[in-house]
Amino acid sequence: MMARNVLVSGGAGYIGSHTVLQLLLGGYSVVVVDNLDNSSAVSLQRVKKLAAEHGERLSFHQVDLRDRSALEKIFSETKFDAVIHFAGLKAVGESVEKPLLYYNNNLVGTITLLEVMAQHGCKNLVFSSSATVYGSPKEVPCTEEFPISALNPYGRTKLFIEEICRDVYGSDPEWKIILLRYFNPVGAHPSGDIGEDPRGIPNNLMPFVQQVAVGRRPHLTVFGNDYNTKDGTGVRDYIHVIDLADGHIAALRKLEDCKIGCEVYNLGTGNGTSVLEMVDAFEKASGKKIPLVIAGRRPGDAEVVYASTERAESELNWKAKYGIEEMCRDLWNWASNNPYGYDSSSEDNSH
């Protein structure tokens, strides 16, 4: 059975909006639920445009997942075949300062969603977990069997939600759940119309680089250049957001398989790239020089993290197609057209 009606929580966000577009283009009908805490409704207006005639199969509700009655209303109006759950707060530093905010938002939101899904007989879920659950891995590449641990409250919310999902499946084998552990999503849709638009100071390398390139910040701070890596800077597995979005569609297809329980897949490229290599690729793509300031290591930052991709390749039939050149090219296309993100636009932000 082809999952036709999909609810996407957090669908106005960075990864969510790109996934919603790929879903629409793939023939799905999509209902987005997002409280717009860290996103803009403009992203969905642009998704609708990019989807052309497929755009009419998109609807949006500005709702917080903790608002049970609003969520129940949405589930009673549409019979969903599956849910893709992106919604959650994701700033590591803020999670350390405000742990209860993170636990309340991410855990209570997810538990409410799972309860309402069960109540309405929708037991197919794709959850956006994160490579952060590997903590500081003792070796690489990270396989799905590695022990999981987390270094901050944000990471713990991802880890706890994974455990909750395993317990829900353990209690009721009608559930089919896929946990996707993303590595480091970067880039943007090749149109340059949607992309990453973090509020406040970005936590991740590439949104920071993009803000330096468009003149919003004076320099990039590199945390640690004394790691035991090729150039002393931290190594991560960067993945193009379009590849990541396509991974979610592969996961939805997998949910149609009757033999599935609660499964975990890494979504990465399997290649490690250092901070300096990434900055260099971005400078080439943009023609801009990124001034660097070297600082000490950030506590809790791992040295080298990249994915083992074998399981996703063999079981989801999915493989990342794009390299860092395309990631940087598409990122710059988005950033140069939208230097202030969605606030650069004159589109009405009120609906």
UniProtKB/Swiss-Prot annotation:
Widely expressed. The keyword NAD applies. Disruption phenotype: No visible phenotype under normal growth conditions. InterPro entries: NAD(P)-bd_dom (IPR016040), NAD(P)-bd_dom_sf (IPR036291), UDP_G4E (IPR005886). Optimum pH is 7.0-9.0. NAD(+) binds at G13, Y14, I15, D34, N35, L36, D37, N38, D64, L65, F86, K90, K158, Y182. Enhanced activity by NaCl. Inhibited by UDP. Pathway: Carbohydrate metabolism; galactose metabolism. Its EC number is 5.1.3.2. Its cofactor is NAD(+). It catalyses: UDP-alpha-D-glucose = UDP-alpha-D-galactose. GO terms for biological process: galactose metabolic process. It comes from the Eukaryota. One of its GO terms (molecular function) is UDP-glucose 4-epimerase activity. Substrate binds at residues 130-132, 182-184, 203-205, 221-223, 236, 298-301. The active site is at Y154 (proton acceptor). SUPFAM superfamilies: NAD(P)-binding Rossmann-fold domains (SSF51735). Forms homodimers and heterodimers. Belongs to the NAD(P)-dependent epimerase/dehydratase family. This is UDP-glucose 4-epimerase 5. The lineage of its organism: Eukaryota, Viridiplantae, Streptophyta, Embryophyta, Tracheophyta.
